[in-house]
From Swiss-Prot:
Origin: domain of life: Eukaryota
Keywords: Exocytosis, Protein transport, Transport
Name this protein carries in UniProt: Syntaxin-binding protein 2
Entry function: Involved in intracellular vesicle trafficking and vesicle fusion with membranes. Contributes to the granule exocytosis machinery through interaction with soluble N-ethylmaleimide-sensitive factor attachment protein receptor (SNARE) proteins that regulate membrane fusion. Regulates cytotoxic granule exocytosis in natural killer (NK) cells.
């Protein structure tokens, strides 16, 4: 499946802007990368795509390499001291250099001291290209980005890292600006009023974008582009979403199963013995794209339907499309192995999720939803919240992190509890060793203890949602309300101020643009550039998978008039969120940062 959305834009930037820009027919080159640039490339490109462009070998700059003095090298590097020193070292040897010549592409702005060092080195004689391509983010999905900076939550919110805060915000601002520039956007910037971080980050992004705009005056031009917005929200605006057990396929799988680096591992039973299978869950799998945002109750049904349709189209007979049946069909029709394996993977994945759900999660979901909503499935306000949570806290079969999720949801609903009450709850739950984790929610801006032991919540106003939902999936992320308000142009300007006034848009101008171009036009590089407006959302402190889903849902609801992208320093699962909280009262030497 061809890359979609944001991934397609980044692939094009790397293939056209880097590799093809220095390519000559019939000439092979070497591609040298460091860890950050390799992460960017592998998030959107296959090795076969790179090799098809006349690259003979891809190497890591920090590893020992065999010299190939007959070939020129393309360097795609982050502009760090370590990578620049390794680059200079490649051209210090005698009698020959490691490569014939160097085409250097930095993923971002190279600091002046490093630039000067390059100029003074022997490398200067063989440099044929030297460019900064401003690509300092990972395209995680078609509409999701990551700045690949999971440590930033610690730097921003741990009191021991107060001296790092300003520098960390500046780095994040630069990365967000490269995202906007890559998308050819110069958006109006808004932030949630209140927290210092969101305002500071918003102003820093504007300064970086203005520098890009000075270099490329056409950035963000186009009648509908003036409506594009970048919205910065902090995790404290919605600490509920990353705590809940989500029952949509992607979020549920990443929460309940051990999926590392987007790889799902499971046992398959073959003819004789069982063996482990590893499957990458990404957008190359069109079935995953179709299923990932569906409720688990609908997933198995959908896979079974699709499998039945596939079997009928190939004239295969199947009574019931299940995993056992699949292995029989595979034996008969090995030529369809690739397609049938895909169905098998998703049946396994759904089955795995349901096993965990039926085991211990089912009883937690209702409690979590009631606490998140402040009301039960009938819409009745919860009168006795203690009665709701005590059975969970006392249940020895519920794992500590699951108890903590319920405990934090209770504290958030109450807008904090008294110190005495908190101590009792922690004791009931038998999670004394996690008491600092629970209190650390305060570092993010949540209220954990207050002297009054208040029973009133200070939550943002929520939309009334009338569409039918599953009883255990009533909550929708706060950011979904905010996204809908932006595209309907009704987001409160006092609560979400602009850093600078948005450009005026006349409706006639917007209409002409749509009629003339539709929502797309081609740019010089040959990729389809979006002419309609974009909403780019950045959440300080990590983005939850339910929030990622919201970006797709809101885009779909606008029927393509808007494209919503969302991202953060890193992608959160509930475990990851609690792990992040756990570090916020610790010294750097005491923790293992990701």
């Amino acid at each position: 499946m061809a890359p979609l959305g944001l991934k397609a834009v980044v692939v094009e930037k790397i293939l056209s802007g880097v590799i093809r820009s220095v390519k000559k027919d019939g000439e092979w080159k070497v591609l040298i990368m460091d860890h950050p640039s390799m992460r960017i490339l592998s998030s959107c490109c296959k090795m076969s795509d790179i090799l098809a462009e006349g690259i003979t070998i891809v190497e890591d700059i920090n590893k020992r390499r065999e010299p190939i003095p007959s070939l020129e090298a393309i360097y795609l590097l982050s502009p760090t001291e370590k990578s620049v020193q390794a680059l200079i070292a490649d051209f210090q040897g005698t009698p020959t250099f490691t490569y014939k010549a160097a085409h250097i592409f930095f993923t971002d702005t190279c600091p002046e001291p490093l630039f000067s060092e390059l100029g003074r080195s022997r490398l200067a004689k063989v440099v044929k290209t030297l460019k900064e391509i401003h690509l300092a983010f990972l395209p995680y999905e078609a509409q999701v980005f990551s700045l690949d900076a999971p440590h930033s939550t610690y730097n921003l919110y741990c009191p021991f890292r107060a001296g790092e805060r300003g520098r960390q915000l500046d780095v994040l601002a630069q990365q967000i600006a490269t995202l906007c520039a890559t998308l050819q956007e110069y958006p109006s910037i808004r932030y949630r009023k209140g927290p210092e971080d969101t305002a500071q980050l918003a102003h820093a992004v504007l300064a970086k974008l203005n520098a890009f705009k000075a270099d490329t005056p056409s950035l963000g031009e186009g009648p509908e582009k003036t409506r594009s917005q970048l919205l910065i929200m902090d995790r404290a605006a919605d600490p509920v979403s990353p705590l809940l057990h989500e029952l949509t396929f992607q979020a549920m799988a990443y929460d309940l199963l051990h999926i590392e680096q987007d790889t799902y591992r499971y046992e398959t039973t073959g003819l004789s013995e069982s063996r482990e299978k590893a499957v990458l869950l990404d957008e190359d799998d069109d079935l995953w794209v179709e299923l990932r945002h569906m409720h688990i109750a609908d997933v198995s049904k959908k896979v079974t339907e699709l499998l039945k349709t596939f079997c009928e189209s190939k004239r295969l007979t199947t009574d019931k499309a299940n995993i056992k049946d699949l292995s029989h069909i595979l034996k008969k029709m090995p030529q369809y192995q690739k397609e049938l394996n895909k169905y098998s993977t998703h049946l396994h994945l759904a089955d795995d999720c349901m096993k965990h759900f039926k085991g211990s999660v089912e009883k937690l979901c209702g409690v979590e939803q009631d606490l998140a909503m402040g009301s039960d499935a009938e819409g009745e306000k919860i009168k006795d919240t203690m009665k709701l949570i005590v059975p969970v806290l006392l249940d020895a079969s519920v794992p500590p992190y699951d108890k903590i999720r319920v405990l934090l949801l209770y504290i958030l609903l109450r807008n904090g509890v008294s110190e005495e009450n908190l101590a009792k709850l922690i004791q009931h739950a038998n999670v004394q060793s996690y008491s600092n984790l629970i209190r650390n929610l305060e570092q993010l801006g949540g209220t954990v203890t207050n002297s009054a032991g208040s029973g009133t919540s200070s939550r943002l106003e929520r939309r009334e949602r009338m569409e039918p939902t599953y009883q255990l999936s009533r909550w929708s992320p706060v950011i979904k309300d905010v996204m809908e308000d932006v595209v309907e142009d009704r987001l409160d300007r006092k609560l979400w101020p602009f850093v600078s006034d948005p450009a005026p848009v006349s409706s006639s101008q917007a209409a002409v643009s749509s009629a003339r171009f539709g929502h797309w036009h081609k740019n010089k590089a040959g990729i389809e550039a979006r002419a309609g407006p974009r909403l780019i959302v950045y959440i300080v402190g990590g983005v939850a998978m339910s929030e990622m889903r919201a970006a797709y849902e809101v885009t779909r609801a606008t029927e393509g008039k808007w494209e919503v992208l969302i991202g953060s320093s890193h992608i959160l699962t509930p475990t990851r969120f609690l792990d992040d909280l756990r570090t916020l009262d610790q010294k750097l030497e005491d923790i293992a940062l990701p």
